[in-house]
Amino acid sequence: MTTSIIERIDAWAEKTPDFPCYEYAGTRLSYKELKRQSDAFGSFLLKNLNTDKEKPIIVYGHMSPLMLVAFLGSIKSGRAYVPVDVSMPVERIEQIKKAADPSLFICTEELPSNLTITGCPVLTQDQLMDALEKHFGEVPDKEACVKNDDNYYIIYTSGSTGNPKGVQISQNNLVSFSNWILQDFSLSQGLRFLNQAPFSFDLSVMDLYPSLLSGGTLVPLDKTITANMKDLYREIPAQNLDVWVSTPSFADLCLLDDNFNQENNPGLIRFLFCGEVLAKKTASELLNRFPDAVIYNTYGPTEATVAVTQVKVTREVIDAYPSLPLGVIKPDMRLHIVDQETGEVLPEGEKGEIVLIGASVSKGYLNEPEKTDQVFFDYKGYQAYRTGDSGIIKDGYLFFQGRLDFQIKLHGYRIELEDIENNLKKVSYIQNCAIIPKMKDEKVDMLVAQVIPTNHDFEKEYQLSAAIKNELKEFMPAYMIPRKWIYKTEFPLTMNGKIDRKALNSEVNK
């Protein structure tokens, strides 16, 4: 059982010093090097950063080994880290920086030319490398390290106002998650873990920490590879993976390649899915292609540390239910299905809101007490979270029944539809809009924007769409930009004067 994340990771530097903790595209980082570099960086931070330890450190970059060094160095200095991926638009990065109020902004990659960080010190990649060299051999005071209920990481998710909100995950939260996943998912020493998700997406925690805590190797597939199908299909078998961690959508992409099978990936015997609905046909095809593999379906919001339920997806499970179960709750957690209006706990078989209680639940949103109080509460001395997800329990399994609000999952990313709408309304060509999810195989397939445009001079609708998307890309991530655009002169309204979203949904999902 792990009680300290850092102590257990550092222990591998003694047990297997030369074993790679990270390996990709010719770049290799051993456990000994990870400890030495994170020690050096932790020492640098303790000597040079005199601000309040409650203020986190933003770590900007993609999937380089320097990200791991910066994460662990921050923890060793007693400060939580906020991962920010290079794929984020400048405006989003600025929003996160403003909301997090960090003590330091670390760059493991070069910042975009149109982004200027003000209000806190910035450490460039060159300065980071210089700090690692100058403080090489130094070991930070263990007492300074993040511990117990201290924040360990803060991940920013989509917020309904158009501004992201930072979910605080403590050392205790992460210890609870890590112990569960290492034991219940039978993850032994020295395995090679796929890292598909960027570190700013909490699905990455499902591969990063189980890998480091079990003396395994993290094998990232960065955005240059995943953006090119041929490169992706060539790279996967070359990585000799043992453990697959991804969204179901990424697996669907890989299943388009006939060579994605057990014969070409003989070590790949565990699949862990989280972040969105796992369709039965995806699970079934994986079992066809990888007959010796074990497939786990999991569920959990960022606010409950990645995942809190799991089920082994077998042929029997696939055949027994109309949709796949999300599984059973982890041992140190409780799960209630409650009436959304009254809060009354409902019996098995009745649909209601999923409420999570226990060791995995976050303390709330950073610097957002009002938003925290809206969804987090104390339940008999335990931290609890109203997920906004609708669920039902059958045969002891949790089943997902959709969102109670306008929040959806698309390709593993949690998105507030209101967030997209608020951003669309900033565009000069848009008077009003509504975002409708197009459903396919029990999950969101794409986002459809229904738009009332302002007066414009474009002759063709595709020209208008291109102009809108060109504006949007300046302040909204690519995964949030709708794929289909429908233009209207007016929206149907409900009796109380609101946009009739049911009518719009019926048009999109005929």
Curated annotation (Swiss-Prot):
Asked if the Swiss-Prot or TrEMBL record annotates the protein with the keyword NAD, the reply is: no
Its UniProt pathway annotation is:
Cell wall biogenesis; lipoteichoic acid biosynthesis
GO cellular component annotations of the record: cytoplasm
Residue positions binding D-alanine: D202, V306, K498
Give the main localization category. cytoplasm
Question: One biological-process term from Gene Ontology?
Answer: lipoteichoic acid biosynthetic process
Which positions are annotated as binding ATP? Answer: T157, S158, N297, T298, Y299, G300, P301, T302, D389, K498
The catalytic activity of this protein is classed by the Enzyme Commission as 6.2.1.54
Q: Cross-referenced HAMAP family, in alphabetical order?
A: DltA (MF_00593)
Q: What is this protein called?
A: D-alanine--D-alanyl carrier protein ligase
Q: Which organism is it from?
A: Listeria monocytogenes serotype 4b (strain F2365)
Species classification: Bacteria, Bacillati, Bacillota, Bacilli, Bacillales
Q: Which gene encodes it?
A: dltA
